[in-house]
Amino acid sequence: GFIGELERFFALISEPKFHPSKELIDKLNYLSTLGHEPPLVAIVGQFSSGKSSFLNALLGSDILPTGVVPVTAKPTFIKYAPNYMLKILHNDGRDEYKNIDELSAFVDQRHALKDVKNLTIYAPNEILKKISFIDTPGLNSRSDADTYETKMILKEAVALIWISLIDNAARKSELDELNAIPNDLRQNAIALLNQKDKLSDEDIARVLTHANTTYSTHFSSVAAI
């Protein structure tokens, strides 16, 4: 079929005799997955904005641990598989697989995360058959390497959901991070202002008006949840 022919073509022009650049090889590898992988939606937001809780609610299952220590200290893919599983990609390219029950304990070990590039959580969730998610540590991480990794991953995403605490929405502290969102992703990006139950209806309307003005060049729509 077409996908098979495409993969054979990619394999051919990736051969050393064609002197392909690493950037080209990475792009070809990404394109070759498009026939198999569901589209990737990025979940982005500042620390403790409720990204993991939002994803759990969306998926109807507590797949991601929540609490003080964020699982998204590293980029975390959430993908479909028949069984729960955790894959750890180390900086040296080595894959390590663990039982999903070990996830919380693993992310509590900050020293262990230093050698990790990203995590993938596999789950037998029907939504994940159609959409994969990437829960990111944000674009203002203390680690330049983590920020770079997030930016590279965003290039693979087809849509983006920004999660912001409603009482902290559209403040200057967010704008530098928002400016790092790729321009071609902004038309498929939305902002969700989390924990609207903290505010009165009048305050929600005021915040939404301010956010729509501030976010106008970054998101196609803004909503309070």
Residue ranges of each PLM-predicted region?
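Generic structural signal of hydrophobic/aromatic residues within well-ordered alpha-helices
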Residues: L6-F9, L24-L28, L103, V107, ...
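Globular "head" domains of long coiled-coil molecular machines
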Residues: G35-I225
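Pre-Walker A adenine-sensing motif
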Residues: K22-L34, P38-P39
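Residue-level recognition of alpha-helical structural elements
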Residues: K17-L24, D146
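Charged, amphipathic alpha-helical linker segments immediately N-terminal to NTP-binding catalytic cores
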Residues: G1-H19
